[in-house]
């Protein structure tokens, strides 16, 4: 993993940054030592911050919801932060399992169809899955591993896994991962059989509350967000020029996602740029003053974004690869979004070659202009336990949290919503594609639920919820 020095966080820790600069000598030595201006303070949620949320959840029985004193809350919220951050390693283990299932950069073996196809519940892995485990182990021990394989190698080293034990560890991890995927699917089936739509939504909205925190990302989610914002504009919920500062919570890092599992291009982040371009395309923002802040607790994500922003200050563009699988059968709107992504904030670039094993995959590449890449600032913040303390009128006008709050229970989601509300300007918009807690701070007004399909056959898509800060 990239080296990481996490800033000290006290009751109101300050992360300092020079205006428009992420770089000093320590940054060059360790790219994830993030330096911000005194304007940006990361604070734990106080008892006063969450008093409204605690009242709503007093009888829920969820951990932390029955706390009635400030001192007890201060202890609990810090313990909660440590517990949430401890889930990052399990998320990395999940990403490594996806790399075993679908990766093409280290082997020409056929990809597996899904985690469930790796073997039977509680039983050994299939020979096809074991062959891919062995291929990854060989790659990890090779002299010149690629970027993702180096990450796996460094992760195993950090976990204290000896070279001779790597195969056993990765096998057990894949078995665990496959069993969990089956359990998630079973929970959804059982909720569907209940006939209770509230039960279905609750199950979907908290499905991964005990799972490791994944850093996966997807282009199509950003298409759904743009379509949703267009709808809000049509309904007069958003005005031209109303967005200056955007917060992207959990921006993601394209390691090997659970849908397509591509790993033949460098690690990349997309959502910060997608949010920026959408705001510009819809005339919600102006190129000269738009800013994007990413809030994440994953050191690898923060380091990656800090590095790209630093390199942009030196005039280096940021290149993203945009794959499209013809088997996904995108509707025309999705195809148009993919075809024109990056036209406002960059120029078309030469894409990397697609591996022969990935038939039907087309690739576009976009070189994002340094003037836009340099406008992204990463913040090490856990939105469930912390908030960015912002001066008046310096809050966020648009907040995006996709595929992230599903990793938390209803009380944790409500805490996140309380944090988000406190970071927003009045009239600001909050978007999420997770079914969130119906019990949340009154300062967030529910506006709409917008459905967007990613397939002409309607097999999958997103439901985007929108809220407005009163």
What spans do the regions from the language model cover?
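Bacterial N-terminal signal peptides that target proteins for export
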Residues: 10-26
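Class I S-adenosyl-L-methionine-dependent methyltransferase module
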Residues: 41-48, 52-200, 252-380
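Class I SAM-dependent methyltransferase Rossmann-like catalytic core
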Residues: 181-243, 261-265
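Conserved Class I S-adenosyl-L-methionine
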Residues: 326, 441-469
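A short SAM/SAH-binding and catalytic strip from SAM-dependent methyltransferases
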Residues: 396-411
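A short glycine-rich, Lys/Arg-flanked "PGG" loop and its adjoining helix->strand segment in the class I
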Residues: 414-426
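Conserved beta-strand signature within the Rossmann-like core of class I S-adenosyl-L-methionine
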Residues: 426-435
């Amino acid at each position: 993993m990239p080296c990481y020095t996490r800033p000290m966080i006290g009751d109101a820790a300050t992360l300092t940054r020079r205006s428009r600069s992420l770089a000093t000598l320590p940054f060059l030595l360790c790219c994830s030592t993030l330096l911000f201006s005194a304007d940006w303070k990361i604070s734990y949620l106080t008892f006063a911050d969450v008093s409204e949320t605690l009242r709503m959840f007093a009888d829920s029985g969820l951990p932390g919801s029955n706390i009635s004193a400030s001192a007890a809350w201060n202890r609990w919220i810090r313990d909660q932060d440590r517990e949430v951050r401890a889930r990052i390693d399990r998320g990395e283990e999940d990403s490594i399992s996806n790399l075993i299932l679908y990766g093409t950069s280290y082997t020409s073996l056929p990809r597996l169809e899904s985690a469930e196809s790796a073997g039977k519940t509680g039983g050994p892995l299939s020979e096809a899955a074991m062959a891919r485990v062995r291929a990854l182990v060989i790659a990890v021990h090779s002299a010149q591993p690629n970027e993702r394989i180096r990450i796996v190698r460094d992760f195993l080293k950090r976990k204290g896994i000896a070279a001779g034990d790597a195969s056993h560890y990765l096998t057990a991890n894949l078995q665990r991962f496959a069993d969990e995927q089956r359990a998630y699917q079973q929970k959804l089936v059982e909720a569907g059989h209940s006939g209770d739509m509230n039960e279905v939504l609750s199950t979907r909205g908290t499905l991964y509350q005990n799972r490791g925190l994944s850093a996966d990302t997807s282009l199509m989610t950003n298409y759904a967000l743009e379509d949703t914002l267009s709808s809000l504009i049509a309904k007069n919920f958003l005005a031209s020029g109303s967005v200056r500062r955007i917060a992207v919570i959990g921006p993601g890092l394209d390691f090997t996602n659970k849908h397509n599992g591509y790993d033949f291009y460098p690690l990349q982040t997309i959502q910060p740029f997608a949010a920026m371009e959408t705001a510009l395309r819809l005339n919600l923002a102006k190129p000269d003053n738009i800013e994007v802040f990413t809030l994440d607790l994953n050191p690898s994500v923060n380091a990656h974004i800090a590095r790209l922003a630093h390199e942009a200050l030196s005039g280096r563009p940021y290149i993203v690869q945009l794959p499209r699988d013809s088997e996904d059968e995108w509707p025309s709107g999705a195809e148009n979004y993919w075809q024109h992504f990056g036209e406002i904030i960059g120029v078309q670039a030469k894409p990397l070659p697609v591996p022969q094993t990935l038939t039907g995959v087309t690739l576009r590449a976009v070189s994002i202009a340094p003037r836009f890449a340099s406008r992204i600032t990463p913040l090490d913040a856990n939105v469930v336990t912390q908030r960015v303390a912002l001066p008046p009128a310096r809050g966020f006008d648009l907040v995006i949290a996709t595929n992230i709050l599903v990793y938390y229970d209803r009380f944790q989601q409500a805490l996140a919503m309380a944090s988000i509300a406190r970071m927003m300007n009045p009239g600001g918009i909050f978007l999420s594609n997770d079914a969130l807690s119906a019990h949340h701070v009154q300062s967030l007004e529910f506006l709409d639920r917008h459905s967007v399909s990613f397939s002409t056959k309607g097999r999958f898509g997103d439901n985007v919820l929108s809220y407005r800060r009163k």
